[in-house]
Amino acid sequence: MATKSTEKHTPMMQQYLRLKSENPDILLFYRMGDFYELFYDDAKRASQLLEISLTKRGSSAGEPIPMAGIPYHAVEGYLAKLVQQGESVAICEQIGDPATSKGPVERKVVRIVTPGTVTDEALLPERFDNLIAAIYHHKGQFGYATLDITSGRFKVSEPNTEEAMLAELQRTAPTELLFSEDFEPVHLLEKRNGNRRRPVWEFELDTAKQQLNNQFGTRDLVGFGVERAEFGLCAAGCLIQYVKDTQRTTLPHIRSIIMDHQDDSVILDAATRRNLEITQNLAGGFNHTLAEILDHTSTAMGSRLLKRWLHQPVRTHDVLNQRLDAIGELKESGLFADIAPQLKNIGDVERILARLALRSARPRDLARLRNALQQLPELSQTTQEFQQNHLLTLAASAQPIDSICELLERAIKENPPVVIRDGGVLADGYNEELDQWRDLANGATQYLEKLEQEERERHDIDTLKVGYNNVHGFYIQISKGQSHKAPAHYVRRQTLKNAERYIIPELKEHEDKVLNSKSKALAIEKRLWEELFDQLLPHLEQLQSMANAISELDVLSNLAERADTLNYCRPVLTKETGINIEGGRHPVVEQVMSDPFIANPIKLNPDRKMLIITGPNMGGKSTYMRQTALIALMAHVGCYVPADSAEIGTLDRIFTRIGASDDLASGRSTFMVEMTETANILHNATKHSLVLMDEIGRGTSTYDGLSLAWASAEWLATKINAMTLFATHYFELTELPNLFTGLANVHLDAVEHGDEIAFMHAVQEGAANKSYGLAVASLAGVPKSVIKKAKQKLQHLESGQVSVPATSTTVKEEHQLSLIPEISEVEEALANVNPDDLTPRQALEELYRLKALL
């Protein structure tokens, strides 16, 4: 927004412009009565983003001032829309008293809502993490920090390549990303909402260390194991400063920072996460993903933890076996069936505690926290049956916290209002002084009944009543027929059709006392509300530990239920290289198919590291490859897998080159996308990687594609020695196992019945003998006349004769293409000619002979 002189504006608009100048890059919601108003460019932008009316208010330099507004009671819905579009909003409230203000009511920005720092329940995706991140770049190296403000989970890492950095961005999917003004690889930031440019100095190392030490109350960062991660700390320092600035309060729930070591995880690049459809399908939705099948958790915080596990598979066998042991006990004992319903009543304690830490928790947050704590005794009874060490550790952290539960039971009403603003939150009996003022504020009904009875008897007026309304306050009402009996000290206040209303000094005095008591009771209640936070915050760490334990117990119990319901087996994790699966199934496809899923084995080891997979389209090659990767992934998450048995060696990375589409925005063709992903695999795969390669080379000419596919397969097999599944339609590649050790052919079979085809979906040893392309084309609805013509062409090709209408030349061709084309007779004859040995006449004769060979 351009700078605007405030001299020619009203005092209110001058105040607005001053506040806007302090928040120039974000929308300012300026409270005016029952509305939040936006002006100038903010109003234009908000009207577009929120689809609200753009109006005008006053003028500036002779031009009307654009204005847009939203009702204050509906603000959460509008904030949610803006946050989803990556926008940030400064909320400016009236903090002064309009009755005592001279000039505009005092206002100030009380909070800044940004996509990565929201904690309000209405603005957050319930079952997905909401992260804010900062990225730092220096001479090809990266520092990366992420924070989940709703849990206090603060992590830092140092990806050493652009490819690794892109994979981290894909894995963490931050809703807000901070970057320096001099950040160079800006292509990493493309196609993202919520990017925030920050000053260079916020990323300085010394500033970062000071910010972090101030946050944690430490002298140095050695105890967190991040002292030497200087690039990561630069990002983390900027991040913590930004969050403090937006929250306008302390952050007591952020007590540590964790170094995310890539060596501890199985690395999945961006293409692999997309192709395996872990938490998002290829269309961008949640349906038919691995998470949809596995996530039957009882709590939202458990659901978020499971997705973190799925996106960051672990290489450490101790951690994995600990999870598998726990799942095994819950499954075999059947305790998962008891735990799930108990956890359903606990709710999202993790995010409630974040709002408690930020002192933004609402009355119903504390009511839900109370309800959660009330479930712990029953859960504790169930967990007494645990025997496995890790389950016992979780049970110890999820024990009842009686003191806090009792405090909340005494303090909060059973069904409190949404906000503290109008009171009515704290329970009767919690505070004696509050109860006294409330009794008075509620009108002291007993006093009024006594006054009514006395006045009625004293003046012999049986229609006399004492009443109250918001306009006239307390009054005495007498019917028209008896109004002549009203004593002289009754002062008429209102005349109705059938009655007169009066006021007397005693009633006026009581009214003043009652009205004063309401404001007094509200002030006391708000003070006690803040004191309640002070009583709860010292227990924050214990409460967070409880929430973390319940989250993990929820995930383990859920995975036990999934293993039991879906007939999964426990994988055996080995240190040796290899994958040996019997009766493997695709976890998603088997659930969405109406027909029984055909289970298949796979065996990869040092003597059999690459499978060349052939077979018809729709035969199941891609499903077979993906299920192998998903089973390996699930084993490294520490959960049971869809197979009869599975032995999984340690993996360092999983790569997939499956399918492709044009990247029009970047000007990259399908083939370019395919080759970029292939290059990434050939550069970064190791002998401990699992590589899935599907139809390499099909986006270019036959010989180019075949050559690239052959060379890629040979490189993976001989130079990298990665465990590889290589699906292809180039049947020449089935010769590779005859040329190199450690390779084998397998195929997915099909059976033809006349013009129909039946896909067997069973993996067989050896190469396929047909591709069944015409049968698949017929299934797809290609016109019969086209299929008929194709069959004729196929017969000509297979017989070695192809008629080319443009010439009379007959092309002879083998049934299978060769990798290196054979030299033609003309080329061979020409190669044998030495021009220096020929006379002019001989040269002319040789030329005629060569022409005759064409």
From Swiss-Prot:
Pfam families: MutS_I (PF01624), MutS_II (PF05188), MutS_III (PF05192), MutS_IV (PF05190), MutS_V (PF00488). The keyword Transit peptide does not apply. The keyword Iron does not apply. One of its GO terms (molecular function) is ATP-dependent DNA damage sensor activity. Keywords: ATP-binding, DNA damage, DNA repair, DNA-binding, Nucleotide-binding. One of its GO terms (biological process) is mismatch repair. It comes from the Bacteria. InterPro entries: DNA_mismatch_repair_MutS, DNA_mismatch_repair_MutS-lik_N, DNA_mismatch_repair_MutS/MSH, DNA_mismatch_repair_MutS_C, DNA_mismatch_repair_MutS_clamp, DNA_mismatch_repair_MutS_core, DNA_mismatch_repair_MutS_N, DNA_mismatch_repair_MutS_sf. PROSITE patterns: DNA_MISMATCH_REPAIR_2. Gene3D superfamilies: 1.10.1420.10, 6.10.140.430, DNA repair protein MutS, domain I, MutS, connector domain, P-loop containing nucleotide triphosphate hydrolases. GO terms for cellular component: cytosol. Belongs to the DNA mismatch repair MutS family. PANTHER family: DNA MISMATCH REPAIR PROTEIN MSH1, MITOCHONDRIAL, DNA MISMATCH REPAIR PROTEIN MUTS FAMILY MEMBER. This is DNA mismatch repair protein MutS. The gene is mutS.
